[in-house]
């Protein structure tokens, strides 16, 4: 019996492949558990259309992420912070504070996506921002004392 695999099946194949499976295996395990569908022309056509739609959504999402990356990399955050007695910052700058400053520039990023150590001294820093799908942006931060 020919089946279209919906999920990867160990020993049979990967999702999207059309495979020959024994009738009992297909009827009693693969199809009821949602691992496969009977490979009719309509099912194959529907699967291909769904894959095209997913691919288009992914392209659109990647384009939006690349646009966001360019926007982040074009911004330099200037953060003014109180200084302690020894010239160090009074309190550290965290990813939460960086996310709040990005909001002021119209960029909303979850603080969990900003990969940085706490900044405790005045100076220039480059911070990695993870946007998803393997896309990373470099954010420049300039910390100044008050």
From Swiss-Prot:
<dbReference type="Pfam" id="PF03948">
    <property type="entry name" value="Ribosomal_L9_C"/>
</dbReference>
<keyword id="KW-0687">Ribonucleoprotein</keyword>
<dbReference type="Pfam" id="PF01281">
    <property type="entry name" value="Ribosomal_L9_N"/>
</dbReference>
<comment type="function">
    <text>Binds to the 23S rRNA.</text>
</comment>
<protein>
    <recommendedName>
        <fullName>Large ribosomal subunit protein bL9</fullName>
    </recommendedName>
</protein>
<dbReference type="InterPro" id="IPR020069">
    <property type="entry name" value="Ribosomal_bL9_C"/>
</dbReference>
<dbReference type="GO" id="GO:1990904">
    <property type="term" value="C:ribonucleoprotein complex"/>
</dbReference>
<dbReference type="InterPro" id="IPR020594">
    <property type="entry name" value="Ribosomal_bL9_bac/chp"/>
</dbReference>
<dbReference type="GO" id="GO:0003735">
    <property type="term" value="F:structural constituent of ribosome"/>
</dbReference>
<dbReference type="GO" id="GO:0019843">
    <property type="term" value="F:rRNA binding"/>
</dbReference>
<keyword id="KW-0689">Ribosomal protein</keyword>
<dbReference type="InterPro" id="IPR020070">
    <property type="entry name" value="Ribosomal_bL9_N"/>
</dbReference>
<comment type="similarity">
    <text>Belongs to the bacterial ribosomal protein bL9 family.</text>
</comment>
<dbReference type="GO" id="GO:0006412">
    <property type="term" value="P:translation"/>
</dbReference>
<dbReference type="InterPro" id="IPR009027">
    <property type="entry name" value="Ribosomal_bL9/RNase_H1_N"/>
</dbReference>
<dbReference type="InterPro" id="IPR000244">
    <property type="entry name" value="Ribosomal_bL9"/>
</dbReference>
<dbReference type="InterPro" id="IPR036935">
    <property type="entry name" value="Ribosomal_bL9_N_sf"/>
</dbReference>
<dbReference type="InterPro" id="IPR036791">
    <property type="entry name" value="Ribosomal_bL9_C_sf"/>
</dbReference>
<dbReference type="GO" id="GO:0005840">
    <property type="term" value="C:ribosome"/>
</dbReference>
<keyword id="KW-0694">RNA-binding</keyword>
<keyword id="KW-0699">rRNA-binding</keyword>
């Amino acid at each position: 019996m020919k089946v279209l695999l919906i999920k990867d099946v160990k020993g049979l194949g990967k999702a999207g492949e059309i495979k020959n499976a024994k009738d009992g295996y297909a009827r009693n395990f693969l199809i009821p558990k949602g691992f496969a569908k009977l490979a009719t022309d309509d099912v194959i056509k529907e699967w291909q259309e769904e894959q095209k739609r997913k691919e288009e959504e992914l392209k659109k999402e990647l384009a939006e992420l690349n646009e966001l990356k360019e926007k982040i990399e074009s911004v330099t955050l200037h953060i003014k912070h109180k200084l302690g007695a020894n010239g160090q910052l009074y309190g550290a700058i965290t990813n939460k504070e960086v996310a709040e400053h990005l909001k002021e520039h119209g960029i909303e990023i979850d603080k969990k996506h900003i990969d940085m150590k706490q900044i405790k001294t005045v100076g220039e820093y480059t911070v990695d921002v993870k946007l998803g799908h393997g896309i990373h942006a470099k954010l420049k931060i300039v910390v100044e004392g008050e």
